[in-house]
């Protein structure tokens, strides 16, 4: 996304459009823990959507819209949300731990290609 913004600006010289928009900032491990822990988050990605409850003990309960529920584990590490999911009828092999950058603020966050909003 940044490269697209830079490419768009390259052809516009000597024009002042005001201060640049703030880029999303990375979050610390403590930030991610405080944001997610004990709360339910509605998420939407390219292939699925649903709601996840992130428990403070590092477990999660995941409801995938139209597919069912599964459990998982989560942790924060180096500005990333790391998640693994247990097998379920719609997810026969489960998903091993995978980490993706988490950015955002307020009640809207981005994890990989998914958008999270407070449920």
Locations of the language-model features?
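Lipid interaction determinants
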Residues: 9-119
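Sec-dependent bacterial lipoprotein signal peptides
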Residues: 1-7
């Amino acid at each position: 996304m940044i490269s697209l913004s830079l490419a768009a600006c390259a052809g516009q010289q000597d024009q002042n459009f005001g201060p640049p928009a703030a880029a999303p900032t990375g979050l610390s491990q403590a930030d991610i823990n405080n944001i997610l822990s004990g709360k339910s988050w509605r998420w939407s990605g390219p292939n699925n959507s649903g709601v996840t409850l992130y428990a403070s003990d590092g477990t999660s309960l995941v409801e995938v819209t139209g597919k069912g529920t599964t459990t998982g584990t989560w942790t924060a590490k180096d500005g990333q949300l790391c998640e693994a999911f247990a097998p379920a009828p719609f997810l026969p092999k489960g998903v091993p731990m995978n980490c993706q950058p988490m950015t955002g603020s307020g009640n809207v966050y981005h994890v990989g290609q998914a958008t999270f909003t407070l449920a």
